[in-house]
Every structure is written in C-alpha cells, then in structure tokens.
UniProtKB/Swiss-Prot annotation:
This is Acetylglutamate kinase. InterPro entries: AceGlu_kinase-like_sf, AcgluKinase_fam, ArgB, Asp/Glu/Uridylate_kinase, Glu/AcGlu_kinase. It catalyses: N-acetyl-L-glutamate + ATP = N-acetyl-L-glutamyl 5-phosphate + ADP. It comes from Geobacillus kaustophilus (strain HTA426). NCBIfam families: argB.
C-alpha cells in the first residue's frame, strides 16, 4: 500500500459536505493514496435523545453515556450516520464500506471513568487488520467511533481521539480534521500554520473559540514522530488538489506566532 490518509468528519459538518470535498477524496485515490474516514454524529445523537426523551448530560465535554444513551448512540452512529455517509461517498463514485469500531474488535476500548462518564471509552488497541483488508480490496473504510472491550461491552468513543488512534495504528502519512470553515481563521484570514505554542496564544487571544478548541487540541494530541503534522480543512471546499493541501497545518516543531 502507498500513503494512507485518515479523514475525520465531525457530525456537524456531514450535512454540508460539498462536491468539492468528494472531488478532493477522489484526487487522493487517483494519486495512489489510501483513505480511511472516521465520523462523528453528536448533533444527530442529541436530536434522537431528545426525540426519545432519554436524559443526557455532558461532563468535561464528553456525553455521559448510560445504557439507555449508549443504545441511542449505537443506533444513530452505526445505523444512520455511517450508512448515510457511505451512500454519499458511493453517489460520488467512491467505493466505501461502513464499519463500526466494534466490527472485528477494530477499536478495543476501556472505560475512561465509569463512575463519572458511564460507557464512554478510550481506545486501548486498534486492530488494523480489518482496515488493511478493506484498503487492499480497493475500498474506503468508513468507521463509526464505537469500541468494544474483551467482555463484549460496547463504548461510546470521542471521534477525534478515535481518528488519532486509527491514524497512529495504520501509520497514516496525514490526518485531516474536516470542519465547516477553511481552517483556523484570524480576522477572517486563514492561519496557514500553527504549533502548540501558537495555538495556546490563539486560544488566549480569543482567535480560536468554541467548537474549534477541542478540534485543535485533538489535532495536537495526534501529533507524533510518525505523524509530524495534522490538517484542519473545510468540507465545503476543495481541500486537496494537485498534491497541495488547503487548510491550517498543525505541526510539532516551534514556529513563528502568526
């Protein structure tokens, strides 16, 4: 296999994915890259919990997951959102196969803090053989962020951290977080590059706010010697063309504050 790119699509951006997004994915494949997509589904989960009158709360930014909440999370992520995204990819000429982190024990999980969060898990191990098998057969694996432990208990996993774990396990050359903006913006202009140091300053200065904060923190935590840079890109426009990425590049090394 050649280079592998992991793309993380947040639940809030799935309805806004444009033809340009799918064209970017097609370009990658035409250039010999393998693509794995990990998706979220927070807004859809919230709507379904409300519709079914299942009580839910957030603790430190994570959805406390009772057995009742977990049943809805599984239904929405694997039964609805995953299949919708697979259908969208196929409509755009991209051969996709939807899997859950439970399938084949792909994402082995353990509870983060059962007393506080219930069935919210962290990825303990990624069994990447299933992904490699699908990639070698020419498919784009589309992964819903559910995990399973050795006793067969399923867990709700944060999609950003799941994407980072998958990228590390398969030796991805790039990890891209897809949002509804072109990247980190300052006064409406794109911040082309950022490091941990510059990101902390941008947060302090109120440049990075709201939902972008957990995105950039997840991007920073995904950085390693094997994955020295991560992208934040838009799902509304072309983010990869002619071998060039369009968005904010987040790197490990110290850079200049922009």
């Amino acid at each position: 296999m050649g280079k592998t790119v992991v793309i993380k699509c947040g639940g809030s951006v799935l309805d806004e994915l444009s033809p340009a997004f799918f064209a970017s994915v097609r370009t990658m494949r035409e250039q010999g890259m393998d693509v794995v997509i990990v998706h979220g589904g927070g807004p859809e989960i919230g709507q379904m919990l409300k519709k079914l009158a299942v009580p839910s709360e957030f603790v430190n930014g994570l959805r406390k997951t009772t057995k009742e909440v977990l049943a809805v999370v599984e239904m929405v992520l694997s039964g609805k959102v995953n299949k919708q995204l697979v259908a969208m990819l196929r409509q755009n000429g991209l051969p996709a196969v939807g899997v859950s982190g439970v399938d084949g024990g792909l994402l082995e999980a353990e509870p983060i803090d059962f007393a506080k969060l219930g069935y919210v898990g962290r990825v303990k191990t990624v069994r990447s053989r299933l992904l490699r098998t699908l990639l070698e057969a020419g498919y784009i694996p589309v992964v819903s962020p559910l995990g399973i432990d050795q006793n067969g208990q399923t867990y709700n996993i944060n999609a950003d951290t799941a994407a980072g774990a998958v990228a590390a396990a398969i030796g991805a050359s790039q990890l891209a977080f897809v949002t509804n903006v072109p990247g980190i913006l300052r006064d409406g202009a794109l911040v082309a590059e950022a490091t941990a140091e510059t990101i902390e300053r941008l947060i302090e200065d109120g440049v990075i706010t709201g939902g972008m904060i957990p995105k950039v923190k997840a991007a920073l935590s995904a950085l390693s010697d094997a994955l020295p840079e991560v992208m934040i890109v838009s799902g509304k426009t072309t983010f990869y063309q002619n071998g060039t990425w369009h968005g904010t590049t987040i790197r490990k090394e110290v850079g200049v504050y922009l």
